[in-house]
Swiss-Prot record:
Family assignment from sequence similarity: Belongs to the UPF0260 family.
Name of the molecule in the record: UPF0260 protein Ssed_2516
NCBIfam families: PRK05170.1-4, PRK05170.1-5, PRK05170.2-5
Annotated signal peptide: none
Pfam families membership: CxxCxxCC
């Protein structure tokens, strides 16, 4: 059932809400904001809890204990989280867009997402190994395909 087509984000239960996350890992990338222009830049430096091979958080349930600055995406804050990538299901649905063809809820697995290049799989380094974030700015997280 395509619950995301029949319900608003606010109407979804916890299981439905959590299943919207495709697990791409882009939200777990460190981001920089230019002080003068306020432009957002993604880096390939991932949160220390992110598994670079598949994009899942190794301590998802307890992530706030390990990374207090981690942001939980909720129906109440999704509109404010402008740093979420355009490919993010929460952002897409909030903006009235459809889920993309590669989304795991459409395809039944994360493989199509990885093949489409929409995840962090094998593209990141751990933030603890980065000396200068500016040296790790990348454009691929901005990619958004239907």
């Amino acid at each position: 059932m395509s619950f995301w087509k029949n319900k608003t984000l606010a109407e979804m239960d916890t299981q439905e809400w959590e299943s919207l996350c495709d697990g791409c890992g882009k939200c777990c990338l460190n981001k920089l904001i230019d002080d003068e222009t306020e432009e957002l830049y993604y880096t390939n430096a991932a949160c220390k809890l992110l598994d670079p091979k598949d994009g899942h958080c190794v301590h998802y349930v307890q992530r706030f204990n390990f990374v207090p600055s981690c942001t939980q995406v909720t129906v109440d804050n999704v509109a404010e989280l402008t740093w979420l990538p355009d490919s993010c299901a929460y952002r897409r649905l909030h903006l009235g867009r459809e889920l993309p063809s590669w989304h795991p809820l459409i395809t039944g697995s994360k493989e199509a997402m990885h093949i489409a290049g929409m995840s962090i799989k094998n593209k990141v380094t751990c933030e603890t190994k980065v000396k200068y974030m500016e040296d790790h700015i990348v454009l691929w997280p901005l990619k958004d395909i239907e």
